[in-house]
Every structure is written in structure tokens, then in C-alpha cells.
Amino acid sequence: RDAQESRGLGDVYKRQVGKIGKHTVELMQETFGCRPEEILAAVGPSVCMDCYEVSEEVIDKFREAFDKENWDQLFYKKANGKYQLNLWKANELIFLESGILAEHMAITNVCTHCNSEILYSHRTMGNKRGNLCAFLALK
């Protein structure tokens, strides 16, 4: 793997564009025989749409990865030429595409940037911050 790939969860939007959630579900199916309709999925605290301003270059990657019919749920263009991006909605769409039922998803509405006094936020703190964790469990 190259250095960019090894950064893991660091470049959050790249994980949504690459649909890591879908690949995880596929791997769970292949490896453990999991059925998507029985999988429970959760998205923990992360930056909210109001706090996640991105460039058109980032949005172009989302345009390539997601159906046009979903673009208005994922992002909108601001007067300054930048965009606001909804990673929570991106995760929801990825899980639905993977066969996970909507009622089996829990997507927090806790923004790391808005709550940086209690949560780490790259948007607030830059590289001088800790990390949140991600986990996967089989039952």
C-alpha cells in the first residue's frame, strides 16, 4: 500500500467515495456468510454538513461515486464557489446500496467540529488532536 492508502480513516471523504462501507458488507458476506438485511450499522460522531465545506474537486469525486438523483441530498454549492458536503447521508446511501435495512442503521447527529470541546475534530484542531475509533463486531 502507498502512504495515502495507509492513512486509514484520516481522509474521511475518501472512504465514502471509495464506499468502504459497501466493501465491508461484501467482505462480511464472503467471509462470514452475513446477510446484509441482518447487519446492524452505525456511524458515530463526525463532521456535519454545516461544518464540512469542501472544494469542487472533492465534489467531483462524489459526482462520480453517487447517482445524480442523490446529489441534492449529499451536497450544495455556496455563493463562494465552495460546497457543503453531507457525509452522514453518504454513509446512509452506501449502507442502503449494500442491502442494509434503513431500520438497522443508526447515524448520529453529533458533529465533532460543533462539539470539539469533548470530541476530537480535525476541522477544529488540525493535526494536533487525537483520534476517534471505529469498530466492527460479529455476534
PLM regions and their residue ranges:
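Active-site microenvironment for binding and transforming phosphate-containing groups
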Residues: R1, D11-K139
